[in-house]
Design a protein with these regions (language model features):
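Charge-rich, low-complexity N-terminal segments
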Residues: 1-41
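Short, internal acidic amphipathic alpha-helical interface segments
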Residues: 51-99
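Extended hydrophobic/Leu-rich segments
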Residues: 19, 23-27, 41, 55, ...
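Ampiphathic alpha-helical segments that act as solvent-exposed interaction surfaces
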Residues: 62-78, 99-136
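Short, highly charged C-terminal tails/helix-capping segments
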Residues: 130-149
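A short acidic-to-branched-hydrophobic micro-motif
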Residues: 35-57
């Protein structure tokens, strides 16, 4: 399956790095977003993960309120059902994830991967902007000032 996915990546001709033979990951930067694609050979899936925002301090008293803003982005009236946004406590980042079934030999795989990537870039960019705006609003409400970015 790794060879199939790497072939599809090459056919898309958008500069995707091939899957690493050991980690089965492909780290890419698209429109300023770090997007990692990871194959799961057992489940026959390709997971897309996009870091939206680094978190400085989850012990900050504002974090629980900010986390509510993060989770609200999962509403179906905004984010498609095959994507989810959450907090990675290991990486201290807000991440968006999506999963795509891969069937070697399926001629539509390239189109589905391209759709997933375009969706990640669009929704990732919009989500990041919304999160930054929410963070700035929370910071203003609690301290009366906005931090310098």
């Amino acid at each position: 399956m790794r060879e199939f996915i790497n072939k599809v990546f090459a056919e898309l001709d958008i500069g995707l790095r091939p899957l690493d033979p050991e980690t089965l990951e492909s780290a890419n930067t698209m429109s300023g977003l770090n997007i990692v694609l990871r194959a799961d050979l057992g489940a026959m899936t390709l997971e897309g993960r996009c870091d939206l925002l680094a978190l400085d301090d989850i012990c900050d008293p504002r974090f629980p309120e900010f986390q509510k803003h993060i989770l609200r982005l999962n509403d179906l009236d905004f984010l498609p059902g095959d994507f989810r946004i959450g907090v990675s406590l290991v990486d201290l980042t807000v991440q968006m994830k999506g999963v795509l079934s891969v069937n070697p030999g399926d001629s539509g795989t390239g189109g589905r991967i391209m759709h997933m990537l375009k969706s990640m870039v669009f929704y990732g960019t919009v989500s990041r902007d919304r999160l930054l705006s929410s963070y700035d609003e929370l910071y203003q409400e609690s301290s009366g000032t906005v931090p310098e970015n």
